[in-house]
Every structure is written in structure tokens, then in C-alpha cells.
From Swiss-Prot:
It is an enzyme of class 6 (ligase). This is N5-carboxyaminoimidazole ribonucleotide synthase. Gene3D superfamilies: 3.40.50.20, ATP-grasp fold, A domain (3.30.1490.20), ATP-grasp fold, B domain (3.30.470.20). PROSITE patterns: ATP_GRASP. Its EC number is 6.3.4.18. It comes from Staphylococcus aureus (strain MSSA476). GO terms for molecular function: 5-(carboxyamino)imidazole ribonucleotide synthase activity; ATP binding; metal ion binding; phosphoribosylaminoimidazole carboxylase activity. Belongs to the PurK/PurT family. The gene is purK. GO terms for cellular component: cytosol.
Length: 374
């Protein structure tokens, strides 16, 4: 796909004013673009860095058209906008990311089927539409397995682990509320992710392979480069995905590595991703920089240089008191506080990145600081 390059001073619209929208806006502004953001929250983080703010729900057709009329290009920071609404916008306005990826990825079953058809390695799964399908899941997958809702859910929401017959009731409860997908539970050795930007004329730029750790289904930390030799294999899997899903901009593919060292595609995030935040300080281009380059039709860098290894830590509400006490003693901490008005213990309130020559030691230091609050 090829489209005209946006000139400096043009206006970029962002659907979604959370931290991802804020960091997109900051990258856009340093490149000379104006930013208009649409978000239902009057005090969303992006509002305070955007040139203009439209407060409206994501399904407000009048407001979305207002955004389109004000902007030369539109992008979005998350995948929870209506795919049908996005399709209608794409017919009238310049939205390089398109709607196709959103349409596929909002449905976990369609996502799994698309990944499998693309030739990537995915965890065995089956569709679960009603409670009687659980018997088929037990027969096909065996214990343990995970039941996930087909639609919605993030940071571990909308899923239950079925270890044995005693857990089946929780699975039945979930199926009563939504159609689901059942997946074989893996004995996971490591989680990694690969952030990629696809630009004008199908130019592809890869970031370093990222090693991730989750706590309570929320990303806890990312280490770059990943301490496992899976980069070539991950790139091979991503290239298969790129051939199957239309998308322009930055996206991330999450992988599981099991106890047999097998790499499985877990899911795709069709936008900049939490595990790529380290790139703001640790790389010559951040994931937000390359996203803006892509959606404005600019050329991408041929490769991304990792300037220094890094450890990125998510900061939840419960971490902020500790952070305030420690921050002045650690000038090596690159701190990002998102500006969310409501603080909750398990809500992502910011992140910090530490550039280091010894990621193992830095990881231990971070554990010593934050282990007690997690």
C-alpha cells in the first residue's frame, strides 16, 4: 500500500487519549505535526499534550466525523473501537491502520483461526459456544486448559484456568455470559514479544526481541534484548502474519516459549504495546516514532539500533509511594508518569526504563525495590 506523505504542520487525529495516545502525540509533535484527540474522559492523559481535544464516546458518529474533518490522517491507540464504525470512517477519511486487523483481532476465535491459517504455531484451541462443548475441550485438549471469552478482555480479564473437574463450574459461568475459546494450557518457560512497524510500500522495521514477565496478568517488566535466542524464529512467524493481515503502523506479537523450547504465537496487539515502551530511551527510534512515520507515509529506518540494554518496569498505583521515596536517589531511572487522575492499586500509572550494561543485576535491584509491592 502506498499513500501520500503528510507535510509538516499537518494534523493527526488520535482515537483514544490514554497513555499510548499521549506518547503517540508526543512523537507526532516533535516531528512537526498537530494533534487532535478524541476520548470520553475529560481528563484523559493525552488531552494535556494535544493541540485540541474532543470529548465524546468512541461510538459517537458526529464526533468521529468532526475528528475526521479536522485531521489529515487518523490513528487509534487501542483495539476496542467498533470495527464497523471504523470501517465507515475508513471510507471517508485517511486511516492507514485500516479496520481489517481490528475486525479480526477483536474476536479471539477469528484471531486464532487466522494465525493458524497463516502457518504460525499456535496453542491448540477449540470453539466453546455452550456448556456441552466443555466435554469436547476436555477430550481434545486435556487438563489443564484455559477458557477465554471470544470478545473483550485484557490484562487477564475474561478468562479462567481449568485445572481439573473442580474448576469446571467457573468455566460454565463464563460460557453463560459469552461465547468462548478453550486453549491448551502451556507450561511456559518464558514470554517474549516482537514489536514491528509496517510502513509505506510494505517497508518493515523490527525492534529487538523483548523478554516479558507478567504478574497477576499485568505486564510487570520487560528486558531487552531478550535472554533467549529466538529472534530469527519470531521474525519468521511475524512475516507470516504480515502476509495475512492488512496493517500500517506499529504492532506487537506476543509469544509463549514452553518447557520444550517451542515458540507459540499468543496474540497480536494492533498498536504500540506496553512491552515496547523501553524504546523511548533505549533505541534510536521509539515504537511511537516509527508508528507516526508509518501513518504519515514517511520512510521507516531500515533497522532499529538498541543503544543500550534496558529493563522497563510498569508502575502501578501501589508502586507510587515507593517511587516518590526512591526517585531522587536514582538518576538512572527514566520515569514516565501518565497523568491519570484516578489512582488505583492495580492500574498502570506509569513506567520507568533503566539503561544498563548488566540487565541481570538491574533486574535483581528492581526486584529488591518492587517485590514487596507486587
Amino acid at each position: 500500500m502506498s499513500f501520500n506523505k503528510l507535510k509538516f504542520g499537518a494534523t493527526i487525529g488520535i482515537i483514544g487519549g490514554g497513555q499510548l495516545g499521549k506518547m503517540m502525540a508526543q512523537s507526532a509533535q516533535k516531528m512537526g505535526y498537530k494533534v487532535v484527540v478524541l476520548d470520553p474522559s475529560e481528563d484523559c492523559p493525552c488531552r494535556y499534550v494535544a493541540h485540541e481535544f474532543i470529548q465524546a464516546k468512541y461510538d459517537d458518529e458526529k464526533a468521529l466525523n468532526q475528528l475526521g474533518q479536522k485531521c489529515d490522517v487518523i490513528t487509534y491507540e487501542f483495539e476496542n473501537i467498533s470495527a464497523q464504525q471504523l470501517k465507515l470512517l475508513c471510507e471517508k477519511y485517511n486511516i492507514p491502520q485500516g479496520y481489517q486487523a481490528i475486525q479480526l483481532l477483536q474476536d479471539r476465535l477469528t484471531e486464532k483461526e487466522t494465525l493458524k491459517s497463516a502457518g504460525t504455531k499456535v496453542v491448540p484451541f477449540i470453539s466453546v459456544k455452550e456448556s456441552t462443548d466443555i466435554d469436547k475441550a476436555i477430550e481434545t485438549l486435556g487438563y489443564p486448559f484455559i477458557v477465554k471469552t471470544r470478545f473483550g478482555g485484557y490484562d487477564g480479564k475474561g478468562q479462567v484456568l481449568i485445572n481439573n473437574e473442580k474448576d469446571l463450574q467457573e468455566g460454565f459461568k463464563l460460557i453463560e455470559t459469552s461465547e468462548c475459546v478453550a486453549e491448551k494450557y502451556l507450561n511456559i518457560k518464558k514470554e517474549v514479544s516482537l514489536t514491528v512497524t509496517r510502513g509505506n510500500n510494505n517497508q518493515i522495521t523490527f525492534f529487538p526481541l523483548q523478554e516479558n514477565e507478567h504478574r497477576n496478568q499485568i505486564l510487570f517488566k520487560t528486558i531487552v534484548p531478550a535472554r533467549i535466542d529466538k529472534t530469527a524464529e519470531a521474525k519468521e512467524q511475524v512475516n507470516k502474519i504480515i502476509q495475512s493481515i492488512h496493517f500500517i503502523g506499529t504492532f506487537t506479537v506476543e509469544f509463549f516459549i514452553d518447557s520444550n523450547n517451542q515458540l507459540y504465537v499468543n496474540e497480536i496487539a494492533p498498536r504500540p504495546h506496553n512491552s515496547g515502551h523501553y524504546s523511548i530511551e533505549a533505541c534510536d527510534y521509539s515504537q511511537f516514532d516509527t508508528h507516526i512515520l508509518a501513518v504519515t507515509g514517511q520512510s521507516l529506518p531500515n533497522s532499529i539500533e538498541l543503544l543500550k540494554p534496558a529493563v522497563m518496569m510498569n508502575l502501578l498505583g501501589k508502586d507510587l509511594d515507593l517511587l516518590e521515596n526512591e526517585f531522587n536517589e536514582h538518576p538512572e531511572w527514566h520515569l514516565h508518569i501518565y497523568g491519570k487522575s484516578e489512582r488505583k492499586d492495580s492500574r498502570k500509572m506509569g513506567h520507568m526504563t533503566v539503561l544498563t550494561n548488566d540487565v541481570n543485576q538491574t533486574e535483581q535491584d528492581m526486584y529488591a525495590k518492587f517485590e514487596g509491592s507486587n
